[in-house]
Amino acid sequence: MDNIGAADAATSSGISGLLSGNSFLGAGIGLMGFGAGLAILRRGLISGASLVKRRMLVSVEIPSKEKSYNAFLHWMSTVPKRYSNQLAVESNRQLKMPQNAREKPDKQVANRIFSLVPGPGKHYIKYKKCWIQVERERSNRLQDLTTGTPWETITLTTLSRDRGIFSELLLEAQKFMQSAQKNKTTIYTAWATEWKPFGHPRSKRMLSSVVLESNVKKMITDDVHDFLRNSQWYDTRGIPYRRGYLLYGPPGSGKTSFLYALAGELDYDICVLNLAEKGLTDDRLNHLLSNVPPKAVVLLEDVDSAFQGRERSGEVGFHANVTFSGLLNALDGVTSSDERIIFMTTNHPEKLDPALVRPGRVDVKAYLGNATPEQVREMFTRFYGHSPEMADDLSDIVCPKNTSMASLQGLFVMNKSSPADAVDMAKELPDNPPSTPFSFNVHRKSLSV
C-alpha cells in the first residue's frame, strides 16, 4: 500500500511539474475544461428552457387554411397595445356613389380603404393582462394549391397556463369579423374541395325590392322560416333535416335575384355551384355539399344544362364529370349532410329527370313567370310613385307581349324620371313566347330511381 501511495504521489508531482514547466499545455487543458463546462452549461440551459416552455408557455398554431386566420389578422390590426416591426397592407376598393341624382357620374370617386395587418415576423400584443407573442411565418416552398398563395401559419405563445385565453381571443376575433360583415351577404364558390369567398361581401338586398307574385314570395319565405324553426321536429321523427327548392320559369323572371334577397332576409350566405364545371367529380360534389359553411344556402344554377345530353348519350357521354347518380346521392344519399338548404334554378323544367325533382330532393317547386299586371303595377309604383292609370296602360302593353321582369326593370332604368317615355318605349318591346307553369305530375319516363 505504501508503494502504491508513493507511486501516485510521484505521478501527481510529475504531472504538476509538466504543466508548470509547459505553459502552452496548461493553457490548452484549461481551455478544454472551460469549453466542456460551457457545453454542459449550454445543454443545461437548453433543457431548462425546454422544461420551462413545456411547463409555463402555451402555444397554438393557426394555419392559413383555417377560417379564423384572416379573422385574427384583421382583429389584431385593431388591437391598441400592439408592438409590430413589420406590417402588410391590404386594400379594399369601394365606389363612392353620388349623394343625389343631380351629381354627375364623373364626380364618383373610387376609394381604397387600406388596413395594416401584421406582416411575417414576430409581434407582441396585450390581451386581458396577458402578453402574447404572435409569430407569422410564410413558407418559401409550400403553396396553397387552391389559391396559389404561399402557405402561412400564425403561432400564438403566452406565459400562462390558462389555455382558455386563446379560445376567448379567437372567439372575439370571430365576432369582430362577423360584425364587420353585418348586413352583408357573402358569395362562396367552389375551389377544389372547399368553399372560398368570391370577392368582397355584398350589401344585403331587401326582399321587398324583388317584385314577384305575392303568393309565390310569401309561400317560399314562410316555408323556409318554418323549416329553420323546426329542427327539433325533424330530429324527433328521424327525418333528415334538409330542404330542397326548385325555382323554374323563363329567363329574367327573378329566380337568382329572389334567392339573393331571401338570403339577406334570413341573414344567410350563398354557395354557388356549377354542376357543369370542369373537374367537378362525384366525390368532390359530395364533399362540397357535406361541408357547406354555417348559415349558407346552396345554389345550383341552371341544373338542367349539366345533364341535358344524358338521355341521349348515357352517363359516360355528357360533358361534365359529375354523373347523374352522383348528384342524386349527394342530395339525399347515405353520406349527404343534414342542416342544409338547396335551391335549384332552371329555365327548362321539362328537361329535368323526375328522379331529381321527387319529394326528398325537391320539396317545393315554384314557378316564376313573366310580368303579370300585379307585378307591373308594383314595380311601376316603386319607380315612379302612385299613378294607377299609367300603370294600367303599361300593363296592357307589356303583359300580352310576355315581357320578363328583367326587361321591365331595364325599361324603367332607361327612363328614370319619365314614366310617359317608359310607356311609349314599351310599345317597341319584342313579343316573347308564352310561358306557363309546368305540370310535374304528368308521368314521364325516369332515367334513374
From Swiss-Prot:
Residue ranges that the UniProt entry lists as topological domain Mitochondrial matrix: 42-449
PROSITE patterns: AAA
Chain sites annotated for binding ATP: 249-256
Domain of life the protein comes from: Eukaryota
Cell location: Mitochondrion inner membrane
Pfam families: AAA, AAA_lid_BCS1, BCS1_N
Membrane topology (UniProt): Single-pass membrane protein
First-level EC class: hydrolase
Protein's UniProt keywords contain Hydrolase: yes
Gene Ontology molecular function: ATP binding; ATP hydrolysis activity; protein carrier chaperone
Mitochondrial intermembrane side: 1-20
Main location: mitochondrion
InterPro entries assigned: AAA+_ATPase (IPR003593), ATPase_AAA_core (IPR003959), ATPase_AAA_CS (IPR003960), BCS1_N (IPR014851), Mitochondrial_chaperone_BCS1 (IPR050747), P-loop_NTPase (IPR027417)
Catalytic activity, reaction form: ATP + H2O = ADP + phosphate + H(+)
Family from the record: Belongs to the AAA ATPase family. BCS1 subfamily.
UniProt name for this protein: Probable mitochondrial chaperone bcs1
Species assigned in the record: Schizosaccharomyces pombe (strain 972 / ATCC 24843) (Fission yeast)
Upper lineage: Eukaryota, Fungi, Dikarya, Ascomycota, Taphrinomycotina
